[in-house]
Curated annotation (Swiss-Prot):
GO terms for molecular function: ATP binding; ATP-dependent protein folding chaperone; unfolded protein binding. The modification Phosphothreonine is found at T200. NCBIfam families: PRK00290.1 (NF001413), PRK05183.1 (NF003520), prok_dnaK (TIGR02350). This is Chaperone protein DnaK. Residues 609-622 have a biased composition (Low complexity). Residues 628-642 have a biased composition (Acidic residues). The gene is dnaK. Induction: By stress conditions e.g. heat shock.
C-alpha cells in the first residue's frame, strides 16, 4: 500500500511526518531540521530556493523572496486584509486577471498555490529521501476557519507539487488527533485546541470518545480568524521600531525593502527572545544612510512594551473562543484539557490570556510546532488502510447557502455541521416565464448576500415557460470529507440539471493548474540536470587540477609531442567547464584522461619507486637499531641512607 505522508503547510514554518505501524515520526528536511521555513526565493538564473537557504539570502534579494504566501491563498486582490499586507510586504503583490491576489518575482506572475507548491515539493523530496521510495499521496492541513476557495487552492498547490491530496484536514483537529492518540488512557474528554500560528488563528472544541477500544474525535464547534497570527505580532514590533527610528533620525524605513527585510528578521528574533527574557536589544548597524552618512539602529525592547503593542491582538483571539464554546453548547468548566498549538502560543502573555479565559493551565506536553503534522500523518495512515482505530468527525466552519430574491442569503448547511454532509432545498422563479436561473453560492453568517464570501455561480437554463413561483428547482449542496463543496441544481419539471465543484469566484482553472503542474515538472527536470551538470563539472575540475600538478612535477620527463597533446586537451577541458554543456564537459574530461594516460603511468611508477625506496630505508634503519642494542646484566643497589 502506498504511504500517505502528513504535511502541516504553515504560514511561517511547515512540518512533515509519517505514521507507520502506529508509530509516528517527524521527518527532517535536507538541512537536518524538523521544521522548514515557508519561504521561497526566486533567483536570477531561474533557480528556486526553499526554506532555510531562501531565508538566508532574503536581505539581499528581498523583492524576490516570498514569505507568508498562505495569507494570500484563495484571496481576492481587493480584500481589505490583502490591501493591508501590501503595505508591509517587501515583495510585490499584484492583481491577477481573475481578480486574485498573486505575487510578482523575477518578472514572473505567480499564484499563491504555485508558491506554496514549492514548499510542498521540498516536503515530498524529504519524505522520499527518508523512505527510499516515491511518495505521491499526502494529507495536508489547513486552518479550520479556511473557507471553501482557500481549501480548494491548497488542494491545487498539492497537485502542482505532484501530490494526490487524499484529504484536507483542519489544523486543530490534527493537533487533537496527535494529542488523543498519544494518551494511553481510554478516558472520554472534551478538549479545546487553541491554535495561534504564523498567519492564522483557530479554536476548536473537540470531544474524544473511546468506543470499544477505538477513538472517535468529534469536532463540536470551530471558530477563528484567518488574518491573525505571529506575522501580525512581528508587524506590530516592526511598525513600532520604524516609528521610533523616524522620530530619532527623520528617515522612514518603510521605503527601503532591504531595511524592511532586516527588520523582519530582527523583530522575529526579538519576539522569540522576549518569551524567555524580560528585555532584548535590537542592533542593526548600517540600517540605512542619508547625506550625513550611515545610520545605525540600536533599541532596547522590554517584554512589557511588546505585550502592550500586541494586547489587542491577543484579545482578538479570545472572542472566537467564546463563540466556539457557545456554539458547542458548553461552558469553560466542561473543558477537560486546553491544548496550545502554533509557535505564537509560546508567548507567556498568550498563555496567560488562555488560562484566564478557560480557568485552567494549558497543557505543555504537546509540541506546538509538530503536533499538526503528526496528526495529519496519523490520518494518512488511516486513509492508507494502515490503522482503523481512529474515527474523525470534522465540521464545516461557516454556513453555506445561495442568494435568493431581495439579495438575502438562504442557508442550506449551517456552520459546525459534521462533514461529509448533503442538503437539498426547492426554490422557484422570481418572474413569469423565466427561462433560466443563476445559482449564486455563498459562505458566511450574514443575512445580506453581498456581505458574505462569494464562492461562485452557475446557470440552470431551458426552464419551461410558467408563471413565477411555479417551476420547482431543487438545489443540492454536498460537502465532501475535505470540506470542499459540490453544488447541483435540477429543474424537477424537465429533469434538466447543472452542477459545479466550487473553485471560488476566482481560483485557478483546470488549464492553469495543468500548466503549473507541467512547469513544476519541468523545474524538477531542470534541477536534476543542474545537479548532474555540477557533478560533471566538479569531476572535470578535479581531473584538470590533478593533471596540472602532475605536469608541473613530471612534464620535463615527457617528450615534447606528448606534453603538447596533454596541454591541448587541458586547455579544451578548461574551456568546457566554463560552459553549461554537460555532454561537452564529459567528452573533454574523457579526452584529457586519455591524453594524460602516459603521464599518469609515470606518476604511478614514481610513487611505486618511492614506496619501495621507503620500505628499503625502513629495513636498514631497523637493522642499524638492532646493532646498537647492548646485552647487559643489572645489579640492584640498595640505598641504606633511606
Amino acid at each position: 500500500m502506498a504511504k500517505v505522508i502528513g504535511i502541516d503547510l504553515g504560514t511561517t514554518n511547515s512540518c512533515l511526518a509519517i505514521s507507520e505501524n502506529g508509530q509516528t515520526k517527524v521527518i527532517e528536511n535536507a538541512e537536518g531540521a524538523r521544521t522548514t521555513p515557508s519561504i521561497i526565493a526566486y533567483l536570477d538564473g531561474g533557480e528556486i530556493l526553499v526554506g532555510a537557504p531562501a531565508k538566508r539570502q532574503a536581505v539581499t534579494n528581498a523583492k524576490n523572496t516570498i514569505y507568508a504566501a498562505k495569507r494570500l491563498i484563495g484571496h481576492k486582490f481587493e480584500d481589505k486584509e490583502v490591501q493591508r499586507d501590501i503595505e508591509s510586504m517587501p515583495f510585490e503583490i499584484i492583481k491577477a486577471d481573475n481578480g486574485d491576489a498573486w505575487v510578482k518575482a523575477q518578472g514572473k506572475e505567480l499564484s499563491p498555490p504555485q508558491i506554496s507548491a514549492e514548499v510542498l515539493r521540498k516536503m515530498k523530496e524529504a519524505a522520499e529521501a527518508y523512505l527510499g521510495e516515491k511518495v505521491t499521496e499526502a494529507v495536508i492541513t489547513v486552518p479550520a476557519y479556511f473557507n471553501d476557495s482557500q481549501r480548494q487552492a491548497t488542494k491545487d498547490a498539492g497537485r502542482i507539487a505532484g501530490l494526490d491530496v487524499k484529504r484536507i484536514i483542519n489544523e486543530p483537529t490534527a493537533a487533537a488527533l496527535a494529542f488523543g492518540m498519544d494518551k494511553g488512557d481510554n478516558k472520554d474528554r472534551k478538549i479545546a485546541v487553541y491554535d495561534l500560528g504564523g498567519g492564522t488563528f483557530d479554536i476548536s472544541i473537540i470531544e474524544i470518545a473511546n468506543l470499544d477500544g477505538d477513538k472517535q474525535f468529534e469536532v463540536l464547534a470551530t471558530n477563528g480568524d484567518t488574518f491573525l497570527g505571529g506575522e501580525d505580532f512581528d508587524q506590530r514590533l516592526i511598525d513600532y521600531i520604524i516609528d521610533e527610528f523616524k522620530k530619532e533620525q527623520g528617515i522612514d524605513l518603510k521605503q527601503d525593502v532591504m531595511a524592511l527585510q532586516r527588520l523582519k528578521e530582527a523583530a522575529e528574533k526579538a519576539k522569540i527572545e522576549l518569551s524567555s527574557g524580560q528585555q532584548t536589544e535590537i542592533n542593526l548597524p548600517y540600517i540605512t544612510m542619508d547625506a550625513t552618512g550611515p545610520k545605525h539602529l540600536a533599541m532596547k525592547i522590554t517584554r512589557a512594551k511588546f505585550e502592550s503593542l500586541v494586547e489587542d491582538l491577543i484579545a482578538r483571539s479570545i472572542e472566537p473562543c467564546r463563540t466556539a464554546l457557545k456554539d458547542a453548547g458548553l461552558s469553560t468548566g466542561d473543558i477537560d484539557d486546553v491544548i496550545l498549538v502554533g509557535g505564537q502560543s509560546r508567548m507567556p502573555k498568550v498563555q496567560e490570556a488562555v488560562k484566564d479565559f478557560f480557568g485552567k493551565e494549558p497543557r505543555k506536553d504537546v509540541n506546538p510546532d509538530e503536533a499538526v503534522a503528526v496528526g495529519a500523518a496519523i490520518q494518512g495512515e488511516v486513509l492508507s488502510g494502515g490503522r482503523s482505530d481512529v474515527l474523525l468527525l470534522d465540521v464545516t466552519p461557516l454556513s453555506l447557502g445561495i442568494e435568493t430574491m431581495g439579495g438575502v442569503m438562504t442557508k442550506l448547511i449551517q456552520k459546525n455541521t459534521t462533514i461529509p454532509t448533503k442538503a437539498s432545498q426547492v426554490f422557484s422563479t422570481a418572474e413569469d416565464n423565466q427561462s433560466a436561473v443563476t445559482i449564486h453560492v455563498l459562505q458566511g453568517e450574514r443575512e445580506r448576500a453581498s456581505a458574505n464570501k462569494s464562492l461562485g455561480q452557475f446557470n440552470l437554463g431551458d426552464i419551461a415557460p410558467a408563471p413565477r413561483g411555479m417551476p420547482q428547482i431543487e438545489v443540492t449542496f454536498d460537502i465532501d470529507a475535505n470540506g470542499i463543496l459540490h453544488v447541483s441544481a435540477k429543474d424537477k419539471g424537465t429533469g434538466k440539471a447543472a452542477n459545479i465543484t466550487i473553485q471560488g469566484s476566482s481560483g485557478l482553472s483546470e488549464e492553469e493548474i495543468e500548466r503549473m503542474v507541467k512547469d513544476a515538472e519541468a523545474n524538477a527536470e531542470e534541477d536534476k540536470k543542474l545537479t548532474e551538470l555540477v557533478a560533471s563539472r566538479n569531476q572535470a575540475e578535479a581531473l584538470i587540477h590533478s593533471v596540472k600538478k602532475s605536469l608541473a612535477d613530471y612534464g620535463d620527463k615527457l617528450d615534447a609531442a606528448e606534453k603538447e597533446k596533454i596541454e591541448a586537451a587541458l586547455k579544451e577541458a578548461e574551456e568546457a567547464v566554463k560552459g553549461d554543456d554537460k555532454t561537452a564537459i564529459d567528452a573533454k574530461a574523457e579526452a584529457l584522461g586519455t591524453a594524460s594516460q602516459k603521464l599518469g603511468e609515470m606518476v604511478y611508477a614514481q610513487a611505486q619507486a618511492e614506496a619501495q625506496a621507503g620500505e628499503g630505508a625502513q629495513a636498514n634503519a631497523s637493522a642499524k637499531k638492532d646493532d646498537d642494542v647492548v646485552d647487559a646484566d643489572f645489579e640492584e643497589v640498595k640505598d641504606d641512607k633511606k
